[in-house]
Amino acid sequence: MSDTPAIRLKRGEGHAFKAGGPWIYDNEIAEILGEPADGGIVRIEDYNGYPLGVGFLNRASTIAVRLLSRDAGAVIDRDFLERRVRAAWQYRKDTVDTSSCRVIFGESDFLPGLVVDKFADVLVVESLALGIDRLKSTILSLLVDLLKEDGIFVRGIYERSDAKVRLKEGMERVKGFLSDPFDPVVEIVENGVRYQVDVAEGQKTGFFLDQKYNRLAIQPLARGGRVLDCFTHTGAFALNAAKGGAAEVLGVDASELGVAQATQNAALNGMSDRVRFACRDVFELLPELERKGEKFDLVILDPPAFTKSRASVKKAVTGYREINLRGIKLVKNGGYLATCSCSHFMTPELFTKTIGEAARDARRRLRQVEYRTQSPDHPVLWGADQSLYLKFYIFQVVDDA
């Protein structure tokens, strides 16, 4: 153990890490002992040299060390990785429909910086940290073998490590096949709805699996009603509304590609007669609908992250307040609003406050139906605040009697 390179924390630093956090920042480190390579394994020590665990080192990143184990004597070998992968897959089998799901969710599965999504018989991988990038091939090989034990034969693997955050790790953005080439448009079924998922060109890994059960939750609220789905992407919420029995659904998105894919998905499900999509800027369309006196039984707001840093939170609050204000005004008395934020920096408390301000400005009352977060295959690891990012509310909009 003494031969392992180490980092030693400054006196008084590492509070978040000691409280369960998975990261150590560069400004918390007093010294580096030995000659570890970036992407290599280091022992983590407090100021007095007491061992706290082992993790990946990357001097090029603000996140200098990513935790692998709080056992400072852990050997990071194939057996270690197999235990991690097996535990992650078993957890999914315990908690979610695994036909399509997130199999590995980075720090929450103690494989920092790695995301693996399963779409039917295709795996999509996103590697966001230097250390895990070097173990990616081994982990994927282990996962393929593990799935085979359950009778699941992986047809292909596609890499979507094209996020800008890789540049902060000193890594290039990459995407492409990690297996023999295959048709990257994959059909999946979720909540009884069929989708064509483009794992090569779709947003992120191709489809937002984190909203799986939130989409299911709106189905009964849509029955027989008129539904507006804002920021529809490839139509998932809109199609779940139709699955729930909505009489009429309008899905809106500024992306022509997204609207085209949503339209195809509606046809795939035989819903084209009840679901239509429009390529429009939601911020422009909602005031237009209000001026026309349009009302809906259910309004769904699923915007992209308005902030990806603390510096832009104030601007994001303005955006969330505006979109919720406009959305609330379009809900019939007694109708429902489903609204969410996928930004970690928009805390639950701040998001709740912002919705409340929007309701006040709209002069409407909100009755909370339920509060939800991301689906269980995106587990929230307590102590790792960044693992909680999706906030999802359903409200009934009621006027004073």
PLM regions and their residue ranges:
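Conserved SAM-binding loop of SAM-dependent methyltransferases across substrates and taxa
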Residues: 234-247
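C-terminal catalytic and target-recognition region of SAM-dependent MTase-like enzymes
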Residues: 322, 336-401
